[in-house]
Amino acid sequence: MKVTVVGGGSTYTPELVNGFLARIEQFPLDELWLLDIDEERLEVVGGFARRMVAAQGSPFKVILSTNQREAVQDAAYVTTQLRVGQMEARREDEYLGQRHGLIGQETTGVGGMAKALRTIPVILSIARDMQELAQPGAMLVNFTNPAGLVTQALSQYAPETPSVGVCNVPITAKMSILDRLTEATGKKIDPDLARLDTLGLNHLTWHRGFTIEEEDVWPQVMQSFLADLRAQEKPEWDPQTIAVLQMIPNYYLQYFYYTDKKLKSQEKWPPSRAEEVMEVEKGLLAQYADPALQEPPADLMKRGGAWYSTVATQLLNAHYNDLGEVHVVNIRNGRAIPEWPSDWVLEMPALVHKSGITPLPTRPLPPAQFGLIAQIKSYELLTVEAAVHGNRDAAYQALLAHPLGPTADKVQAVLDDMLAIHRPYLPQFWH
């Protein structure tokens, strides 16, 4: 079996390789293709990946490629973790926000929109090549941020290619809740027996339930979470907000709930998060280039993205082996929440079978959450239209619709700035 990783020169790749090595008995991988446009970086990361695999007795081949069509040919799965414009473009996205007095972030607000405009055409070209060249029914598993928005574009403009979006936030939340329960009870809990009930859009979810072997333990989780917040001098969340909601918000909701605080912290830049990551990556690539290194260094944790390889390889394994496991993914709503539009891509629990991934029927979120979801989904749908058609009016309306976007009198200035700084990666707007 062939699996292709688009953005194979990413510093995350060794973690993914580890995941495949750990599951080789159940997931019989023959060829892992690493595709990247940065040859130098691909050689470093790919060389390290090959040493990792060789150290485990070479259960599969690692093949490096800079040719997209060759890389997706005959693939059973294609995972996407690419970054159009690399880390320099992320830095531009962050400072675009700061320059205009807005949130400057990789996936949220104006930065997330800029990234989506650059990324969507590339992801759709991969889906088209898969339709023509990959194995029949090959699945595209997207990690590229903004993951929900990119998966929304795939669902609308490449519906014939099976696709799903994944993120490490739900599993990180699940593992953190398990740690909390273990601490309280002194008993280690098998993660496979636990299930997190979470719903929303990618980076805009609310965790609202937790079961262990189908027993509801959410009241204990909330009680413990609130007690922790109240004991802290500067808690991450205002305890009253959490007590009223009776849900735990996704970390990224801080940009919406505490916008002023987040804007203030941006004033300290440099370094922005992209600049911090660039330093971490420089160090990681130097370590990866060491011919003696055979397993991922501890510094990889500084890169962020905990549990990334677990999410990816567990999902592929569940799909390949028809396990019927429940995974939290970004997927088209369909009939899972009849009250919400069927064509919305949501982040929600879904059943993973070989025949496909099906969202589990679930109850909708209340108005306080739904209002924000509807607003962000409107922005997402407009951004998809803008990215696919190079439609400046749709891009203008997307900025206007976003609650973290500019006021109406500043939309044009922000849009002009965004399109100008990323002009080489946005040909659809400049024809």
What are these model-derived regions, one by one?
Residues 3-28, 32:
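N-terminal Rossmann-like dinucleotide-binding module
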Residues 14, 139-213:
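Rossmann-fold dinucleotide-binding core
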Residues 27-50:
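NAD(P)-binding Rossmann-fold cofactor-contacting core
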Residues 53-77, 83-86, 103-112, 123-134:
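A structured beta-alpha segment of the ubiquitous adenosine-cofactor-binding alpha/beta core
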Residues 88-158:
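Rossmann-fold NAD(P)-binding glycine/threonine-rich loop
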Residues 185-431:
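Long, compositionally biased stretches enriched for glycine and/or charged residues
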